[in-house]
């Protein structure tokens, strides 16, 4: 797949992730839309394959962070906030171990 197709695919993926993550939050949806479009326009004339690859990696990392780390909260009362967890946020719980593993 050539770099142009990869860039377009990432652009679409970021916008789909934005719509999922910020569902029903018009301000956040608009801010994320503007930021995604702004970043892609800023680097529109980039020709270096190495730089394009670096930007694609960064964009992919941003999409993963948005999808797996952002939690949407809704104010229901003056002192209450309801968090809406998506399926992507519900990861396996891996217990933490203080003791270092012994190498054999």
From Swiss-Prot:
Pfam family, one: Complex1_LYR
Alphabetical list of InterPro entries matching this protein: Complex1_LYR_dom, Complex1_LYR_LYRM7, MZM1/LYRM7
UniProt keyword Membrane, yes or no: no
UniProtKB keywords: Chaperone, Mitochondrion
Protein's cellular compartments: Mitochondrion matrix
CDD domains registered for this protein in UniProt: Complex1_LYR_LYRM7
Residue ranges of the TM segments: none
Biological process, per Gene Ontology: mitochondrial respiratory chain complex III assembly
GO CC terms, sorted: mitochondrial matrix
Subunit structure: Interacts with UQCRFS1.
Family stated for the protein in its record: Belongs to the complex I LYR family.
Purpose: Assembly factor required for Rieske Fe-S protein UQCRFS1 incorporation into the cytochrome b-c1 (CIII) complex. Functions as a chaperone, binding to this subunit within the mitochondrial matrix and stabilizing it prior to its translocation and insertion into the late CIII dimeric intermediate within the mitochondrial inner membrane.
Protein's UniProt name: Complex III assembly factor LYRM7
Species of origin: Xenopus tropicalis (Western clawed frog)
Gene: lyrm7
């Amino acid at each position: 797949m050539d770099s142009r197709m990869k860039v377009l695919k990432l652009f679409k993926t970021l916008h789909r992730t934005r719509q999922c993550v910020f569902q029903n939050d018009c301000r956040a949806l608009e801010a994320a839309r503007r930021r995604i479009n702004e970043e892609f326009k800023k680097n529109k004339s980039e020709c270096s394959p190495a730089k394009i690859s670096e930007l694609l990696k960064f964009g992919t990392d941003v999409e993963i962070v948005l999808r797996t780390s952002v939690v949407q909260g809704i104010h229901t009362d003056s002192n209450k906030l309801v968090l809406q967890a998506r399926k992507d946020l519900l990861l396996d719980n891996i217990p933490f171990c203080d003791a270092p593993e012994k190498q054999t």
